[in-house]
Amino acid sequence: MTVARLMLTDFRSYASATIAAGPGFVVLTGENGAGKTNILEAVSMLGPGRGLRGAALAEMAREGGAGGFAVAAELSDEVRLGTGTTPAAPERRQVRINGAPASATALGEWLSLLWLTPAMDRLFTEGAEGRRRFLDRLVLAIEPGHARHVSRYDAAMRARNKLLAAEGPPDAAWLDALEAQLGQHGQAIAEARARTVTALALRIAAEPDAPFARAALAIEGWVPSRRPLAEELRHGRARDVAAGRTLSGPHRQDLAVSHAAKQQPAARASTGEQKALLLGIVLAHADLVAERRGRRPILLMDEVAAHLDPVRRAALFERLGRSGGQIWLTGTERALFDGIGEATWLAVRAGRVEAA
């Protein structure tokens, strides 16, 4: 399934824009700051979550606009998706599917979305939180229901942490209820992550070493024990009260990535190797999504071509073209995409998008 038409209203730098896209490569070219990434972000908002920038909803509304925004799409099978906010509730996301109100998590039933952005170059060197979000995005593309477990787990954990940090002894009955929720959703999160990492690791292991480095994957940190998580949390209350936060659960996990051939942690690999590792993970995961869900995910690749040498760039275009699916790419000049073949070419200039 692909995006056939994308319509933006008061989204980022766009007062109004309508984009017609073909089923394969969609290439957006323009100067830095022209608004190319804003278009990719709009596409990413057609799934659960806060999109490829992870921004607050209010930040997405156009400066000088009415205060809300709208992103709408017509898919290749005539399904209509829409999301946005109103000026009266700039941080309350609204979603419609074929004109009917729906939840943001329901969007995952229609589209699987994966992306690579320059900000992700720091994925292996920064803290575990970013890698957990990346892992959950990989899981979500295969198991859309994962979003519900993550959001409910996070809400219960925030409530428990607030109780633990309050003065005086926490309400035991309220803790029991929160820990039951954490146990239910935390177990589902941990199991889904483990399934995805196992399947993805096997697929990556079957890939050649070149041109994209093969990654070895594992989950580190908190590991589910035979004791249910709710019970583990109940027994750990005194420790957690002293710490002022919850110390057990899937929010304490990390995605460990290493260079398989060199047996070297990704954090210690060169910048070029890290890019190749990340690209290899995303490409293998796209194949896994296609296998599990029967349709290719939409790939959003922001400035990826500019950071690859000519050999890897050509290999990337060949691999993407052979695999199929819709791939949105951005770059400052058309020459970066020489050899890409048939594509929808779009020129982006200061809040306007035109066929190139």
Swiss-Prot record:
GO terms for molecular function: ATP binding; single-stranded DNA binding. InterPro entries: DNA-binding_RecF, DNA-binding_RecF_CS, P-loop_NTPase, RecF/RecN/SMC_N, RecF_2. One of its GO terms (biological process) is SOS response. Keywords: ATP-binding, Cytoplasm, DNA damage, DNA repair, DNA replication, DNA-binding, Nucleotide-binding, SOS response. Pfam families: SMC_N. GO terms for cellular component: cytoplasm. Its main location: cytoplasm. ATP binds at residues 30-37. It comes from the Bacteria. It is found in: Cytoplasm. Belongs to the RecF family. HAMAP family: RecF (MF_00365). PANTHER family: DNA REPLICATION AND REPAIR PROTEIN RECF. The RecF protein is involved in DNA metabolism; it is required for DNA replication and normal SOS inducibility. RecF binds preferentially to single-stranded, linear DNA. It also seems to bind ATP. This is DNA replication and repair protein RecF. The lineage of its organism: Bacteria, Pseudomonadati, Pseudomonadota, Alphaproteobacteria, Sphingomonadales. The gene is recF.
